[in-house]
């Protein structure tokens, strides 16, 4: 039987970029990868579910490897920061104690939570843990996603559905979800729901459309707030100014 590859990993280097952005000598790479695997679950466990959609870890300067910059993308900035930044500062202290390095955390707000596969999967898992009927939960999630403007969505759930004695698999989909089209912006997430009947697996696959030339994932998804858009536009202007400077000097 053929096995399906992870849609996120399949598009790395084509339309998607890595969530850990750094480089170093070969001897240090395993150690730094291990650090990333420690940092990510620490951040996820520090906050409640359906709060953080993406974590980016950056070590941009090779000479200054004692400094780490972490970008958190969230729909609930108030929970991430806390009163007087208490939650954010306590998280920084935990990470610095864990890896013994200086840490800076940047927070970016996402506005369309029903278009992000991670948040949709976590929300479904939370409702299943609260003993909601799984078919109603899936239909509600799909309707909200389609209203927010996605091209297609597919949700797969496995386990003892509805408390049945035998585990089975059920899925529901609407719209177009082309997993083999590499230029299609496919957002994939997996989450577990721990219920009294056992563990249920939830997979969410969302199609945001095709990433055409001179466009990025941010253009197809349109999930970020004005703060992220300003940062992206400033970066575009910076690179454009560099190109114009090179042309004028040549």
From Swiss-Prot:
Residues 39-111 form the KH type-2 domain. This is Small ribosomal subunit protein uS3. InterPro entries: KH_dom-like_a/b (IPR015946), KH_dom_type_2 (IPR004044), KH_sf_prok-type (IPR009019), Ribosomal_S3_C_sf (IPR036419), Ribosomal_uS3_bac-typ (IPR005704), Ribosomal_uS3_C (IPR001351), Ribosomal_uS3_CS (IPR018280). It comes from Ziziphus jujuba witches'-broom phytoplasma. One of its GO terms (molecular function) is mRNA binding. Belongs to the universal ribosomal protein uS3 family. Disulfide bonds: none annotated. Part of the 30S ribosomal subunit. Forms a tight complex with proteins S10 and S14. GO terms for cellular component: cytosolic small ribosomal subunit. Binds the lower part of the 30S subunit head. Binds mRNA in the 70S ribosome, positioning it for translation. GO terms for biological process: translation. Keywords: Ribonucleoprotein, Ribosomal protein, RNA-binding, rRNA-binding. NCBIfam families: rpsC_bact.
């Amino acid at each position: 039987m053929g096995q399906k590859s992870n849609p996120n990993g399949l598009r790395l280097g084509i339309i998607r970029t890595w969530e850990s952005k750094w480089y170093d000598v070969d001897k240090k790479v395993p150690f730094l990868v291990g650090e990333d695997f420690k940092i990510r679950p620490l951040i996820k466990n520090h906050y409640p579910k359906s709060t953080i959609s993406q974590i980016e870890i950056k070590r941009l300067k090779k000479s200054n490897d004692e400094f780490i910059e972490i970008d958190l993308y969230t729909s609930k900035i108030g929970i991430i920061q806390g009163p007087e930044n208490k939650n954010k500062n306590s998280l920084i202290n935990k990470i610095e104690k864990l890896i013994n390095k200086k840490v800076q955390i940047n927070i970016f707000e996402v506005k369309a939570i029903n278009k992000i596969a991670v948040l949709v999967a976590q929300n479904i898992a939370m409702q299943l843990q609260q003993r909601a009927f799984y078919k109603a939960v899936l239909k509600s999630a799909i309707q909200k996603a389609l209203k927010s403007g996605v091209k297609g969505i597919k949700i797969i759930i496995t386990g003892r559905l509805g408390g049945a004695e035998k585990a089975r698999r059920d899925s529901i989909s609407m719209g177009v979800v082309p997993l083999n089209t590499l230029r299609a912006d496919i957002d994939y997430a997996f989450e577990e729901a721990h219920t009294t009947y056992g563990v249920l697996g939830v997979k969410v696959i969302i199609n945001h459309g095709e990433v055409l030339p001179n466009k990025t994932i941010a253009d197809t998804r349109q999930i970020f707030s004005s703060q992220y858009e300003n940062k992206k536009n400033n970066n575009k202007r910076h690179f454009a100014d560099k190109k114009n400077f090179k042309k004028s000097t040549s």
